Amino acid sequence: MTSLVPPIDGVRRSFVQARGVRFHVTESGPEDGRPVLALHGWPQHHWVYRGLLADPPPGLRVIAPDLPGYGWSGPAPHRWAKDDVADDVLALMDAMGLDRVLLVGHDWGGFVGYRMLLAAPERFDGYLVMNMAHPWQTPRTILPHFWRFLAYQPFVASIGMALQRRTPYLERVIFGFGPKAHRVKPADARVYAERFRDPVVARSATDTYRTFLLREMPSAARNPEVRRSTVPIRALFGMADFAVHHSLAAPETANADDYTFEPVDAGHFVIDERPDLVRARLIALAEETS
């Protein structure tokens, strides 16, 4: 099953081959502008950045790839280990001739962004990250909020194929849960959810959570992250998030030279809810790091 790529006025679309992945890339703004690499999360795709893509801030070239196996990108040649995905996206930067970028990430795109930041800090001028835990966690910080993971992640990791392809789970539960003011609009939720009826996309999402629960969380508990970030990080966080507690992005536990945390009256899907604020913070980061 397939779905049409949702239209966004004025964008350029291409397919770029990198590290065995056929990336679907959507971009806008001047081709010689300062590059901004924007990474989406689950259960979404590049369309979450439609506001920035339709009206890129002056001087910025906004580049929003679909992550491996998501959206309209080809499948990942692995089981979605986040370090593998980080390497895939770094290879995409190489293929597109992007030496340094401003990085933007939300949800799993935020997680992958942190892996990239720590692996190759010289390639990033700054990082705007939204509603994702920073990587400097310990069992003490995670355990009080582990129940949040158990509320949905085991289901996606185990029966995610059927759940995403054959039920309204994404629209009604993931996008429709919580206070009405913070829910994704039904029409927008449908644009995201329809793509996850494709078996490649549903499998990629299932692998995302299965690998996280079975491999990456146990590994992180045994070997906590010790690398320090030298890249300026600006964490924007919707405080009504059910999936990720804001304490997991606390500046007090961030091992970073320059890290700020901004609470926002929004839910998990802060880009959909507050595109104006995301745009403003990107412009501020670009000016700050020029």
Question: What label would you give each PLM region?
Answer:
Residues 2-14, 21-23, 28-30, 35, ...:
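Flexible "cap/lid" subdomain of the alpha/beta-hydrolase fold that forms the substrate-access gate
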Residues 17-19, 40:
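Short strand-coil-strand connectors
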Residues 38-41, 64:
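Structural cue for short, hydrophobic secondary-structure segments
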Residues 41-44, 107:
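Active-site glycine-rich loops that stabilize anionic/oxyanionic intermediates
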Residues 43, 50, 279:
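Conserved catalytic core of two-component sensor histidine kinases
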Residues 47-61:
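Short amphipathic alpha-helix adjacent to the substrate-entry channel of hydrolases
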Residues 266-279:
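Catalytic histidine-centered segment of alpha/beta-hydrolase-like enzymes
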